Amino acid sequence: MSTRTFLAALLAVLLLIAVGCGGGAGKNDNSRSLIFWTAEDNPDRVKATQAIINRFTLQTNIKIKLVAIGEDQLQSQIASASAAGTLPDVLAAASLGFVHSLAADGITDPDAAATVINALGRQTFSRRALSLVEASGKPVAVPSDSWTQLLIYRKDLFTKAGLAAPTTFEAIRAAATTLSGSGMAGIVAAAKADDSFTQQTFEYLAVANGCQLTNQAGAITLTSKPCRDTFQFYVDLLRTGSVQGAQDATSTRAAYLAGKAAMVIWSSFVLDELAGLSNDARPICPQCRADPSFLAKNSGIVTAITGPDATQPSQFGELTCFAITKDANNDAAKLVQFLMNDGYPAWLGLAPEGKVPVRTGTSDQPTKFTSAWTHLETGVEHTKPLSQLYPPGVLKVLATSADTMNRWGFPQGQGRLVGAQLATLPIPKALAAALNGTLSPAAAAEQAQADLETIKQSIN
């Protein structure tokens, strides 16, 4: 081979290597590879995710590069990748607020999301889930699963005291007052100023009372009667029926697992812990020593609640989504379709207690995925199928929870505002000030209103 021929061949090889080492693939790139980011960065879940996408590669010969990124790092990583032109093709386990924020910045591909949803069949998804991911009439991402905020209560204590299930503000207040005392808190709920868990807990009660962040025109409405009443209810409830201090996710869960609280507001991620399947958060109530699953057997679960200013029950929850980015390879839609179909039960199996299906089944088998979900193994060091831990009625309520899910801002097209206010958490700060007596509940609502108006002006 001549020197000139050798150099030409070498140059060709180097060019191929350079293309292969590039960032996110463009729309017209026919290379059979995808970059897949996921916010599920727990090592066990990363391993399980790799197994799922390996199945996709075997079926399609499309290679996937899996990158796990902590949820708290997603915003900065996406911003850097967007600036560098190296966006992933697909982003998994992205929250509702985050995908709406990405869409507002032009990072997601609504047409690609619509293609996936239509191919799978819109009728196979929760209608509410589809409506929550829409902006300007188009889906900004494909909803994959949900977790829901729950009010969990001790059925045995309620029965003994003759109390009604805590499905209304009135019933919650009555139970908290009646059961509080002798080392028992009537209820434990988040109260920490700089904690998103406080935001989620308040929003749960707010939407249940008909309180919305904004009206349809986008004006902040935290001083409306339903919102002012929710501030008052939250403060009164924790002052008279709970323990004092800045409660958070860890302390509230610990109190209920120790048998020191009759009610707790927590997410569905606590369900395996109630059954004693996690060594990091085990039930230690007096009865739990003989039966680690005592709390799972003796806890009632409420999803939707009704406040006095509301006309129907409602609840807070979170949707997680698959977002296809604007520069994605054409094969990205195929991957998401696989994850929402053949790979869907395994995806839900990463953490079934916190991954409730929002696609119930297929056109031919309408309940295929909800049925499969009830038999998925949950737990950490120990595992059991959900169906062995909770009765069918509880699982049915959880499986349909997305249908009564209500979220601030998204129905009003204010997804960007929702994301922006989570950066400074003005509502938890106002609540904490009311709980420690610095502000009255009414003044707390006014402070939160003013802070939200400032945030809204800054992003417009």
Give the positions of each predicted feature.
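Short, low-complexity disordered leader/linker segments with a strong preference
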Residues: 1-35, 443-446, 450-460
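Extracytoplasmic "Venus flytrap"
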Residues: 31-51, 413-419
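Extracytoplasmic "Venus flytrap"/periplasmic binding protein-like
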Residues: 55-125, 156, 160-167, 262-263, ...
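Glycine-centered hinge/linker elements that transmit conformational signals in sensory
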Residues: 176-178, 217-245, 290, 294-304
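Short, well-ordered beta-strand elements
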Residues: 30-41, 62-67, 89-90, 140, ...
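Extracytoplasmic/periplasmic solute-binding protein
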Residues: 136-144, 173-220, 226, 254, ...
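Hinge/lid segment of periplasmic solute-binding proteins
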Residues: 96-148, 173, 198-201, 291-305
